[in-house]
Design a protein with these regions (language model features):
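Positively charged n-region of N-terminal signal peptides that target proteins for export
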Residues: 1-5
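Pepsin/retropepsin-fold aspartyl endopeptidases
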Residues: 19-164
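Bacterial N-terminal signal peptides
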Residues: 6-16
């Protein structure tokens, strides 16, 4: 009986010390699109509500009487400096109305799986041509609420380790 009490006491008093500490992310991190295993740069941006993915050649199509989009994700190969294009096709979840300099723009929003650190997140991304930006992804507040705190003084703190 005493051994049992000691075990319970040990479990209650010491477990927080061994609990996983919450991750603090840098303002720029590497991320992976899964299951395609495409490595991207992501900027964690608390000023954006919906996450945004750099998408090129966006084409709206109909598939099984539903709205879909085909698009390319462009990544610069760090070894060669050449562009690599990865084709994607996803159903449109909704349209996002965004204010731009000359009015409004409607962007398709798709769901994608993104690996941050060792965890896989199923998130929504508005598709937009972000050519010329260093980060292919902006992670907005809807995604950041799942990730945790952002330290604006840090970058590249936790590489993605999810396996395809």
């Amino acid at each position: 009986m005493n051994l049992r009490r000691a075990g319970l006491l040990l479990a209650f008093c010491c477990s927080p010390a061994f609990a996983a500490q919450p991750v603090t992310w840098g303002w720029v991190e590497q991320a992976k699109l899964m299951p395609e295993n495409v490595l991207l740069m992501a900027r964690l941006d608390t000023g954006v509500q919906t996450s945004v993915m750099d998408a090129r050649n966006v084409v709206k199509i109909r598939k099984n009487d539903q709205r879909w989009v085909q698009y390319d994700i462009v990544v610069i190969d760090p070894a060669t400096g050449k562009e690599q294009r990865f084709p994607f096709e996803r159903p449109v979840e909704r349209q996002l109305k965004v204010r731009v300099a000359d009015g409004f723009e409607h962007r398709p929003v798709v769901s994608m799986d993104i690996c941050m650190g060792e965890k896989l997140y199923h998130e929504q991304f508005a598709l937009s041509d972000r050519q010329g930006d260093d980060a292919q992804v902006l992670l907005g507040r809807r995604t950041l609420e799942h990730l945790g705190a952002v330290d604006a003084s840090k970058t590249l703190t936790t590489p993605p380790t999810c396996k395809p």
